[in-house]
From Swiss-Prot:
The chain crosses the membrane at residues 5-25, 28-48. It comes from Thiobacillus denitrificans (strain ATCC 25259 / T1). It comes from the Bacteria. This is UPF0391 membrane protein Tbd_2238. The lineage of its organism: Bacteria, Pseudomonadati, Pseudomonadota, Betaproteobacteria, Nitrosomonadales. Disulfide bonds: none annotated.
Length: 54
């Protein structure tokens, strides 16, 4: 589960780089939404992993 938390976090960072830096001007809105979605998924996966004790 921790693996998935790290994967979601990396995807969130990549989406943030594209969305907040203006590299992909046409996809700014989508990148910002993806950043939030994957950041929430990363946090949720990390918390579930901690609660399971693995």
């Amino acid at each position: 589960m921790l693996y998935y938390a790290l994967v979601f976090f990396i995807i969130a960072i990549v989406a943030a780089v594209f969305g907040f830096s203006g590299i992909a001007a046409g996809a700014v809105g989508i990148a910002k939404i993806l950043f939030v979605v994957f950041l929430i998924m990363a946090i949720a996966t990390f918390v579930v992993n901690l609660l399971r004790g693995r």
